[in-house]
């Protein structure tokens, strides 16, 4: 207990110091963490435009239809009423059905209501259609699941609808369509779909290389393990495993499958996790440099090159990505953190970080945590360091803290939309 209190105090002091230092480190040109953000210029959507520019029920938008919800179905408990006084519900059926929606839809709608009042003082958000129990929409409409709403402004000024659609995009709806001159259509992903795609993790079946030889499943890592990683220059080294930033035992997740041929490798990781990609210029020989860019797994494309452990196990080789696909696994999801901030998973070099597409920023943000771990290891005898964090299910508290701060100080588009599931409000 004393050690845990010491750890917490060290982390808090270190984190505060880091924030104070950031104001001095980010005053130069370019977008810095401590730099004041200017309001982003919003462009209204054009009539019949939809964002993202894919079909509504595809993976890149709101996802597939999962079945109609009725008042007698088991899934009816997934719907929650929205009594926000800043939203006007038309409720032409006079049943309150338009107020029922999924929690994700409710959260986005409430955020949009605030934006509408800020954009047009005296004007409120108006919902004309929400959950549909009467079959008035097309087959497999997301209205039947409480995942879609049709909206206008309270003054019904159609000249505002293009900007209303843009505000809906900014509020976080997964698909927004300027469907009709009379309304805007918005929809969201299913709750279980968001959870399955979110986070920055590897499957429990992934393996790491240990310092004393052999491999180990990532889910079995424990404090004291030293695993193969690489420094900023691509030199291989063994680094201490510190904790899991996220741990979901036996959960079902949707992973991106990155495959290479020369050398042959296959890595599974979630959309928001970072993977190092080599520079694009041609190289006839391996340079062993990791000076390439860290990209979200969802942004890696065939033809780009990732770093793979060579056959002799002595160096990293840039290997061309042969294919990128999606696969669902139920072996759990794990995000190991090493002192180096990198790790070789299934012989492929990856970052330990996710959510923000800046490996160096993320590694810097975890400096107070690494410092605390180092001090605690020096102050406590062997075996006395608390290990509960490595076995606790869910997202590490320090990661949650950084995510909250990042959401506050960074532009919304700097964070991966599937980086972390927002807690229900």
UniProtKB/Swiss-Prot annotation:
CDD domains: Hint. Ca(2+) 2 binds at residues 93, 129, 132, 134. GO terms for biological process: anterior/posterior pattern specification; apoptotic signaling pathway; cell fate determination; cell fate specification; cell fate specification involved in pattern specification; cell-cell signaling; chondroblast differentiation; commissural neuron axon guidance. Induction: By retinoic acid. A lipid is attached at residue 200 (Cholesterol glycine ester). It holds the Pfam family HH_signal. Ca(2+) 1 binds at residues 92-93, 98, 128-129. Expressed in the posterior limb bud mesenchyme, the Hensen node, the notochord, and the floor plate of the neural tube. InterPro entries: Hedgehog, Hedgehog_Hint, Hedgehog_sig/DD-Pept_Zn-bd_sf, Hedgehog_Signaling, Hedgehog_signalling_dom, Hint_dom_C, Hint_dom_N, Hint_dom_sf. The record marks 246 as: Involved in cholesterol transfer. The record marks 270 as: Involved in auto-cleavage. GO terms for cellular component: endoplasmic reticulum; endoplasmic reticulum membrane; extracellular region; extracellular space; Golgi apparatus; Golgi membrane; plasma membrane. Keywords: Autocatalytic cleavage, Calcium, Cell membrane, Developmental protein, Endoplasmic reticulum, Glycoprotein, Golgi apparatus, Hydrolase, Lipoprotein, Membrane, Metal-binding, Palmitate, Protease, Signal, Transferase, Zinc. The record marks 273 as: Essential for auto-cleavage. The record marks 200-201 as: Cleavage. SMART domains: HintC, HintN. A lipid is attached at residue 27 (N-palmitoyl cysteine). Residues 1-26 form the signal peptide. Interacts with HHATL/GUP1 which negatively regulates HHAT-mediated palmitoylation of the SHH N-terminus. Interacts with BOC and CDON. Interacts with HHIP. Interacts with DISP1 via its cholesterol anchor. Interacts with SCUBE2. Belongs to the hedgehog family. This is Sonic hedgehog protein. It comes from Gallus gallus. The gene is SHH.
